[in-house]
Amino acid sequence: MNRARAVLGSACGIHFVHDGFSDILYVLLPVWAREFGLSFAEVGLLRTVYSGGMAAFQIPAGLLAERVGEARLLAAGTAATALGFVAAGFSGSFLALLGCLIAGGLGSGVQHPLSSSLVSEAYETGRRRVALGTYNFSGDLGKVVVPAAVALAVPWVGWRRAVETYAAFGLAVAVVILLVLYRLRAGVEVAPRIETSRSSMDWGIRDARGFQALAAIQVIDNSTRSGFLTFLPFLLIAKGSTVQAIGIALMLVFAGGAVGKFLCGALAERLGVIRTVIITEVATGGAILVLLALPLVPALVILPVLGVALNGTSSVLYGTVADLVTSDRRARGYGIFYTLGVGASALAPFVYGLVSDWGGVPLALGLVGSIVFLTLPLTLLIRRRLAEAAA
C-alpha cells in the first residue's frame, strides 16, 4: 500500500468512528426522552450542543493544526469524544448529558477539517475528488453500522453499557491512528512560520463569492439533514415503531446516503453541479413531505431513496472546496466550510424541537421538507460560479 492510500485509510477510519459517535445520538434521543422525561426542545438541545461543540472547534482546529500538526489533534480529539461518551454512560440527569455531549462535540470538531486536509495533501497531484468521496463514504459506513449495532444492543445490555463499549473502541482507535500517522509522517511535520506579505488572517479563499455560494447551500442542506434525522425516530414511534426498528430505519437512510454520495458525485460529472443539486434537493423535500402521510411499512420502504437524496448534495459540494482555497490554507478553508455547515446542523434540532413542542413533530418535519426548496433560487443565482468551480 502506498503512502497516499494509507493516509486515506487512516482518515477513513477516523471518519467512521466519529460519524458513529455523532449518529448514535439519533437512536439514543428517544431513549433519553423517555428516561429523563424530556420535551422535544430539550431533545433538540442535546443534539444542538453536540453539533455546536463540533462547530465551535473546527476553525480553531484548522489554525492549531498549523502549529502542532494534524496527527496529534486528531488523536486528542478522538480521545476527548470517546471520554465524553464514557461520561455520558454514567450521567443521571439532563444537565449531565448536556455537559458530556458538549465535551464530545468539541473533541469531534477536529475530524472533518483535519482529515480532509490530510487527504487533500496526500492526493495533491492525484485523484483528489475520488479520494475525498471515499473518505466521505467511510463516514456513511459509520452512520450505517454503529447506530444499528447500538439499537440492537440497547434492549439487551441497556443504553449505558452500549455507549460505554463503543466509547472504549473509540479510545483504542485514537491510539492506533496516532501511531499510524506518525509512521506515515502524515500531519506530523509542522511547517516553519515564515512571515510574508500575506496576513496571518488570510484564509486563502480564491473565489469569495463561489465559496459563499457553496457554504449557503451547505447550511440549508445540513440543517435539513439534522432536523429530519433528529425527529424521524419520533415520527416513526408515532407510526408504531420500536427502538430496534428505529435502528433499522436509520440504517436504511444512511445506507441510501452512502449510495447517494457516490451516485450524485458521478451524476455531477455527467449533468453538472447545478442540475445535480437541483435534483437532490427537490427529491429530498418531496420525499420528506410524502413520508409524513405514509404508514410505518411504506415509510420504511422509501427511506433508502430519501437517504440517497438527503446525502447526495454533500458529495457535490465537498470536492469543490479544495479548488477554491490555496493549498497552504486548506485546513482553514475546510474549517470555515464545515463550521458553517455543522453550525446549521447544531441550531436546527433545537429550533425544530420548539416547533414540535408547539405544533407537533409532523408540523416540524413539514417545515424541514419545505425549507429545502429555498436552495433552488440560490442555486440558479450562483449557476456560473458553481459551474466554474466544478470545471
Name these PLM-found stretches.
Residues L25-Y26, G210-A258:
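Extracytoplasmic gate region of multi-pass secondary transporters
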Residues C100-G139:
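Cytoplasmic helix-loop-helix junction between adjacent transmembrane helices
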Residues M1, R185-L214:
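Juxtamembrane intracellular "pre-TM" segments in multi-pass secondary transporters
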Residues W32-A33, L64-A65, L152-V157, L236-I237, ...:
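Interfacial helix-cap and linker-helix signal at transmembrane-aqueous boundaries
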Residues G37, G69, F90-L95, G272, ...:
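Helix-breaking motifs and short loop linkers at transmembrane-helix boundaries and internal kinks
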Residues D23, S51-I59, V144, F254-F262, ...:
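Residue-level signature of mid-helix packing/kink "hotspots" within the transmembrane helices
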Residues Y135-Y182:
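Helix-loop-helix hairpin linking two adjacent transmembrane segments in secondary transporters
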Residues R72-V86, R275-L289:
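Structural signature of the two symmetry-related core transmembrane helices
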